[in-house]
């Protein structure tokens, strides 16, 4: 499954549009709380374990979106957008959403 942030696929013809597809994942309260605690503790460095959790959440959302597109008969998703948003009563969870347009190209 080809995923791209652009509205076209260079050198390819889009033959069918299937519509909007999306995938979501939520990082639980403890991971999110620990994430910000780790950020406060880091000075001039990177929090590898927290980046790993965010990367995994992003990949899960992209896979869910891709699977949805494949079930529709698409072989690509164009105009892919990733959003990160706090959710929950006190904003204690992080939701990662991937969305785009499912298409078939040749």
UniProtKB/Swiss-Prot annotation:
Annotated organism of origin: Parabacteroides distasonis (strain ATCC 8503 / DSM 20701 / CIP 104284 / JCM 5825 / NCTC 11152)
One Pfam family recorded for the sequence: YbjQ_1
Origin superkingdom: Bacteria
HAMAP family named in the record: UPF0145 (MF_00338)
Official protein name in the record: UPF0145 protein BDI_2732
Family classification: Belongs to the UPF0145 family.
SUPFAM superfamilies: YbjQ-like (SSF117782)
């Amino acid at each position: 499954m080809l995923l791209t942030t652009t509205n076209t696929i260079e050198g390819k013809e889009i033959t069918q549009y299937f519509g909007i597809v999306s995938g979501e994942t939520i990082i639980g309260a403890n991971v999110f709380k620990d994430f910000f605690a780790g950020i406060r503790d880091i000075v001039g460095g990177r929090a590898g374990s927290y980046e790993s959790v965010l990367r995994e959440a992003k990949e899960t959302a992209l896979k869910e979106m891709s699977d949805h597109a494949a079930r529709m008969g698409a072989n690509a998703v164009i105009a892919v957008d990733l959003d990160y948003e706090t959710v929950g009563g006190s904003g204690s969870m992080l939701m990662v959403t991937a969305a785009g347009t499912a298409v078939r190209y040749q």
